[in-house]
Amino acid sequence: MKTDIEIAQSIELKPIVDVVEKLGISYDDLELYGKYKAKLSFDKIRAVESNPVGKLILVTAINPTPAGEGKSTLTIGLADALNKIGKKTMIAIREPSLGPVMGIKGGAAGGGYAQVLPMEDINLHFTGDMHAITTANNALSALIDNHLHQGNELGIDQRRILWKRVVDLNDRALRHVTVGLGGPLNGIPREDGFDITVASEIMAILCLATDIEDLKRRLANIVIGYRYDRTPVSVGDLQVEGALALILKDAIKPNLVQTIYGTPAFVHGGPFANIAHGCNSVLATTTALHLADYTVTEAGFGADLGAEKFLDIKTPNLPTSPDAVVIVATLRALKMNGGVAKDALTEENVEAVRAGFANLKRHVENIRKFGIPAVVAINEFVSDTEAEIAVLKELCASIDVPVELASVWADGAEGGVALAETVVKTIAENPANYKRLYDNDLSVQEKIEKIVTEIYRGSKVNFEKKAQTQIAQIVQNGWDKLPICMAKTQYSFSDNPNALGAPENFEITIRELVPKLGAGFIVALTGDVMTMPGLPKRPAALNMDVESDGTVLGLF
């Protein structure tokens, strides 16, 4: 069987100009990056704003195994299948981060016959957006340190600087560093650290900004630290939002590529869902809604993380809310949530499927709390058995949720037709009545408790002393009406990655609260969530190479 990269390299790509012609996009509307990649101009984005708004389909998943459950693959395959049954459809997904590509994932542009192309470019440097975000972030760090060196007119307390440097790699050695060493000519010594680029607030801002002016406004609002008198210091105080926006002036424009089947796709922005809000850009999603009758998008990790943030943080910034949510489930993930060890997930175990169904059931219930109909997609694997599939279908019927098998990895668009038809039927017969989980006017504690008790089903929230102090500071500064972005393990409803399935009566501890005023939310950190990942014992990078003719090897 061919690998993902071999399948991708066997496809004859169409020029991107031809792919997007059916959407009413012309050559003059594009800023080309070679023949197969382009950015859409702001003139065209503004021109389509008066178009009708299409249907929005959000793809999410149950709590995943470390290998992931094929959510991006299902998103791409579903869009291809919708086009196959005659629905004018676009995709709006995130750009992969190079860190996980070189680490555990080895690629994140779909898989099999449900991929966005050119996958090598998308997984590596693409159109340079990640570089621009990294540069803007680190330019701000350099400007902060220069301000300290040049006399510190703003009275910034170097012990209370929140802003970190970033790099788009998994590099645990950079989590804690000291900068400014080497004497008076080299700056003011202070403790610093690096996050991965996709954890930068600038990434979140890029994904929520609606235009250049909104981008500048959000950049100006970033809190970079505190003065000696404990008052906040912003980018606006440094007067450098214009310079940062200049670095990002092209990165804010959505990127256009294609699937194996020629479906147009926006691939733009890529914040993680366990440490950020986990959704592609508002600009890309909104523009897709104005260009197509159906837009298929995704939110990172399980529905407890990505989907909750999509619905509570991103949706209020969109012209519409999701008309349906597709929850991707795999039998291997259900079995893992049912107590099966990782090395036994390919063995038939009907009882483990029954036990693990509690996890899927909770995600379905949670989506319904937002007033949106859910559809379950079983992402098929060769190890799945007829008995396991039959039990899962029976269990889905018991909670009255539509369920379809999807084999888009192996069969492409054809393998998603049944799912596409079910989603279209669900949207037609069950109109969504979207409502947010909480009102922003609730206190910080109440909003967190709402997420923990209603989505995670925990019994109590504990706030460490540091978090309590930060809440008081947030209230004092008038930031307490912002939504909450939970930073939590993706493997469990709880903050314990080993508590699989559908745990109950657990307590969640909030250890820190970080205001992200530019993004417009407050991050609540739980457990041991890292904003700079490390590499595994055997990184995917060990399998990667490039041949003398430029052929890429090892991206899978």
UniProtKB/Swiss-Prot annotation:
Gene3D superfamilies: Domain 2, N(10)-formyltetrahydrofolate synthetase (3.30.1510.10), Formyltetrahydrofolate synthetase, domain 3 (3.10.410.10), P-loop containing nucleotide triphosphate hydrolases (3.40.50.300). InterPro entries: Formate_THF_ligase (IPR000559), Formate_THF_ligase_CS (IPR020628), P-loop_NTPase (IPR027417). GO terms for molecular function: ATP binding; formate-tetrahydrofolate ligase activity. It catalyses: (6S)-5,6,7,8-tetrahydrofolate + formate + ATP = (6R)-10-formyltetrahydrofolate + ADP + phosphate. Pathway: One-carbon metabolism; tetrahydrofolate interconversion. GO terms for biological process: tetrahydrofolate interconversion. ATP binds at residues 65-72. Keywords: ATP-binding, Ligase, Nucleotide-binding, One-carbon metabolism. Its EC number is 6.3.4.3. This is Formate--tetrahydrofolate ligase. CDD domains: FTHFS. Belongs to the formate--tetrahydrofolate ligase family. It comes from Streptococcus pneumoniae (strain CGSP14).
